[in-house]
């Protein structure tokens, strides 16, 4: 086992139970503000294993950009039939309440979620905190010379270098909030155990 695995200590401090959250959106932040959520995926981790995965499809108020459509494959026509964010918030909040929320690239997903909660006049439940798996993996990824941008190693990079099953490849290769939340949970648990090639 590499001595660089000591750089993964922060992952070993994660509780046995937590929630992984991921979103797919209408695009990137721009001069008009933050993008809208199109899908929100939650993976429930209990006793270091995946207990449940669920996806909420939410009707955006903004149009989905061509680039975003190419990433997640959801068209504006499809999204128009989704339920509103506020009509699903109580169910989403029920998963988040009193939990540690793990997000890969939390600096993207978390502000967007908070923006939606405020915009729709909802209330965020009390949570334990937010853990960004991308930022936490930076020291290890850099020491191991793995590709690592300024935000940290991508989920694709960690999936590949850790030998985690690529759930995206099982489908059409596109991103999806449910798939990516589950994939993040598998990557995080692999880093917790330091079990990889």
Language-model regions, residue ranges each:
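Residue-level marker for buried hydrophobic side chains located in beta-strands
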Residues: 19-21
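Metal-dependent phosphoesterase core characteristic of DEDDh/y 3'-5' exonuclease domains
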Residues: 5-17, 32-40, 44-74, 93-197
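Metal-dependent phosphoesterase signature
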Residues: 70-90
């Amino acid at each position: 086992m590499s001595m660089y695995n000591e750089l993964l200590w922060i992952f070993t401090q994660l509780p046995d139970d937590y929630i992984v959250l991921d979103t797919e959106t209408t695009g990137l932040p721009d001069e008009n503000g933050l993008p809208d959520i199109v899908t929100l995926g939650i993976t429930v981790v209990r006793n270091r294993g995946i207990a449940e995965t669920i996806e909420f499809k939410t009707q955006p108020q903004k149009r989905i950009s061509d680039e975003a459509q190419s990433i997640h494959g959801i068209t504006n026509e499809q999204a128009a039939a989704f339920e509103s964010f506020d009509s699903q918030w109580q169910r989403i909040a029920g998963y988040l309440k009193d939990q540690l929320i793990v997000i890969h690239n939390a600096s993207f997903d978390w502000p967007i979620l908070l923006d939606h909660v405020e915009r729709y006049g909802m209330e965020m439940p009390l949570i334990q905190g937010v853990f960004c798996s991308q930022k936490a993996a930076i020291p290890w990824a850099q020491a191991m010379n793995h590709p690592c941008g300024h935000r940290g190693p991508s989920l694709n990079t960690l999936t590949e270098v850790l030998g985690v099953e690529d759930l995206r490849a099982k489908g059409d290769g596109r991103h999806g909030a449910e798939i990516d939340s589950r994939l993040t949970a598998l990557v995080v648990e692999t880093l917790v155990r330091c079990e990889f090639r």
